[in-house]
Amino acid sequence: MKRVVLSSLLVPALLGFAAGALAQADVPHSRDVKKTNLLDHSNSNLIDSATAKQVLIDNIPAKVWKIQNPGAYAFLSQVEGGLNAQRTCVVTARVMVLPLTGTLNVPMWRPLPKMTATAFDSQPNSSSDGCKAVAKDKLKEATLAIGSGIGKM
């Protein structure tokens, strides 16, 4: 009698779990913003925070979420630079992968970040719009470098 009751409760529970897992399998993890921790500390004259976070979302490959737990790390972007007196645009973009604490879900700066990628460029005779385009492009390049190296963590 106990086996019949146990199996009648266990089978629907397993089917419900399997259906939930299949429903989540259709959602690409790289687009699921709720599962990612994105931080931005960029120069607002070059790129705003929403644009920087969108660049991260669009360029972190789905394989990252298959290899790493999305709730275990935060991605920090930082874009610095600007136009100098000679109208040369100088941009440095950095993306870091920071582990999160287990209890508070806060990024840990120490020990050092798990991974860091930096991309930089300069463009002579540039405008402020051209400099913003370079900043976005360099942030994309640094994000793709993080994505390609994530399997080595």
What function would you assign to each model-found segment?
Residues 2-7, 18-62, 150-153:
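A structural "domain/chain start" motif
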Residues 11-12:
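Repetitive helical segments and hydrophobic/amphipathic motifs
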Residues 45-59, 87-102, 129-137:
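Short, Lys/Arg-enriched charge-dense amphipathic segments
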Residues 56-64, 68, 139-150:
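Sec/Tat-exported extracytoplasmic proteins
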Residues 62-108:
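Surface-exposed short loop/turn segments
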Residues 102-148:
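Short secondary-structure boundary motifs at beta->alpha junctions and helix caps
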